[in-house]
Curated annotation (Swiss-Prot):
GO terms for biological process: cobalamin biosynthetic process. The lineage of its organism: Bacteria, Bacillati, Cyanobacteriota, Cyanophyceae, Synechococcales. Belongs to the CobB/CobQ family. CobQ subfamily. Coiled coil: none annotated. Catalyzes amidations at positions B, D, E, and G on adenosylcobyrinic A,C-diamide. NH(2) groups are provided by glutamine, and one molecule of ATP is hydrogenolyzed for each amidation. This is Cobyric acid synthase. Pathway: Cofactor biosynthesis; adenosylcobalamin biosynthesis. It comes from Prochlorococcus marinus (strain MIT 9215). It holds the Pfam family CbiA.
Length: 509
């Protein structure tokens, strides 16, 4: 298929650009995907290049940004790495892991990325677009841009914004966040920095996160339309629903919505945290309050502690040790505390971490082997190749239930025979996916490689009941609200709000 020759035959793509990072591009795309699905169309999300450590694994083991996976759920389809052909995963020190079509193909510095990776990156994007249209000839792509489309020092190497828009001749929407202030300057400045042929692609402007009476912006709307000759097709009100943030900048502002909590959870905010969407199911539990822990403190006020995934496990373990948090966690464990580690968190709960190939943050030979927190008799060695796959297994503890999720990690974890006094048991029928042990004084220490473990409703409910029992709280006998149903409800509510305030009619011809 010659995509360039067939562009006149395909349904016109819709592309969402933003005046800045955090303007609301991801949520706007998610909402439009669900709106079009409900209208009987075949929307497919696409983002040529994303930078995020919040990842998803598709059914073929391909790695992609979690935000595009969510957008696929909004479309009612399975996520595929072709929806996000380039994923950059920051590793610190201005370096990133480069993933093309779901597979890790190397690392690069910010300085060298556009010099070495621009041409192959653009070819990968075109290859993905061609494949999507070959498999789905009646689809309509809903494309997300990145940051601002007019970063003048980078625009000649743009892989995500106007290059894609021009290639597909997409109908573009420009979204801006009025909550941050300065929307008039942002809109006019963005449009003024575009070339005439680029500006012609902008077919509508969206004002996002407006607080108060929408009619109060009517004069502002008229001014923008008169100045730009582009219609303001939507003024989206401030939405209070929880929704997974795309990157760690948003994570800092994310707070639990639970008010009448019975269980207080502390999650360690690692410098290189990854896959923080693992905890969205807990955010949606009415009885749970989540707090993010950023520095050394007495942890005794928490009912359980979570050590999340990490993109740089050695580096983050050194942070825990140097900050005093490692000792805080050990003290918490000795005081009947409940702890669970996920992926890198599991590895850090072990006795040793070895990084012979400098894959997980070791800076020199003295850091190639370091001690873990030492609560589980496990040792981890990091190798050159990482494991990415979907998981379907059964749990043994804290209940017997079907478990779905995914693995995405470097390193192999085995029992540390030198710590035979620390007895542990498997959590799953697949014995290498997780372990737990009960403290002599009460409390449990557990760790698993499965991302998405808390999305499994029965498992989550029984783990929470384990904590409730330790607090002498009544066991919750009713079934937990299905997280996947809750996620669908959030997407529906998001789409309904956008549909009320967004005029897409002219884009659906």
């Amino acid at each position: 298929m010659d995509l360039e020759a067939k562009l006149h035959e395909i349904r016109k793509p819709i592309m969402v650009l933003g005046t800045s990072s955090g303007a609301g591009k991801s949520l706007t795309v998610t909402a439009i995907c669900r709106i079009l699905k409900n209208l009987g169309e075949e929307p497919i999300p696409f983002k040529g290049q994303n930078m995020s450590n919040n990842a998803w694994i598709d059914w073929e083991g391909g790695e992609m940004a979690y935000s595009q996976a969510l957008q696929a759920f909004a479309c009612g389809i399975n996520p595929s790495a072709e929806m996000n052909p380039i994923l950059l995963k920051p590793q610190g020190n201005s370096t990133s892991e480069v993933i093309h079509l779901g597979k890790s193909i190397g690392t690069t510095t910010a300085q060298n990325y556009y010099k070495d990776w621009f041409i192959p990156g653009w070819e990968v994007i075109k290859k993905s677009l061609k494949s999507i249209y070959e498999l789905n000839p009646n689809c309509r792509l809903i494309i997300e841009g990145a940051g601002s489309p007019v970063e003048m020092n980078l625009i000649h190497r743009d892989l995500t914004n106007l290059r894609v828009a021009k290639y597909l001749n997409a109908n573009c929407l420009l979204v801006t966040d009025i909550e941050r202030g300065g929307v008039f300057a942002q809109i006019i400045g963005t449009l003024e920095l575009m070339k005439p042929e680029e500006r012609k692609l902008i077919k509508g402007i969206i004002i996002n996160r407006f607080r108060g009476d929408l009619s109060l912006f009517e004069d502002g709307k008229k001014w923008i339309e008169n100045k730009t000759q582009i219609p303001v097709i939507g003024i989206i009100p401030w939405l209070n629903d929880s929704f997974p943030p795309e990157d760690s900048l948003d994570l800092i502002e994310k707070k639990s919505l639970s008010k009448n909590h019975e269980i207080k959870v502390g999650i360690i905010k690692l410098p290189s945290i990854s896959n923080f969407s693992d905890f969205d199911p807990l955010e949606n539990e009415e009885t749970i309050l989540i707090e993010w822990i950023r520095k050394s403190k007495n942890l005794s006020t928490y009912d359980f502690i979570i050590l999340p995934g990490s993109k740089q496990t050695i580096k983050d373990q050194k942070f825990l040790e140097n900050s005093g948090l490692s000792q805080d966690i050990r003290d918490y464990s000795n005081n009947e505390g409940n702890i669970i580690g996920i992926c890198g968190g599991l590895q850090m709960l072990g006795t040793t971490l070895e990084d012979p190939y400098f894959k997980e943050g070791a800076k020199n030979y003295s850091e190639q082997k370091i001690n873990g927190i030492g609560l589980l008799p496990l040792k981890t060695t990091f190798f050159k190749k990482k494991l990415t796959r979907q998981i379907n297994t059964k749990s043994i503890w804290p209940c017997q239930s079907q478990i779905n999720g995914f693995e995405i990690h470097n390193g192999q974890t085995i029992l540390d025979d030198s710590q035979s006094s620390l007895k542990i048991n498997p959590i799953f029928e697949d014995l290498d996916l997780g372990w737990f042990k009960e403290n002599n004084k009460g409390g449990t220490i557990a760790g698993t490689y499965i991302h998405g473990i808390f999305e499994n409703d029965s498992w989550r409910e029984q783990y929470i009941n384990l904590i409730r029992k330790s607090k002498n709280l009544p066991i919750l006998n009713k079934k937990s609200i299905s997280y996947k149903k809750k996620r669908e409800s959030i997407i529906d509510n998001l789409a309904n709000e956008f549909h009320k305030h967004l005029n897409l009619t002219s884009f659906l011809s």
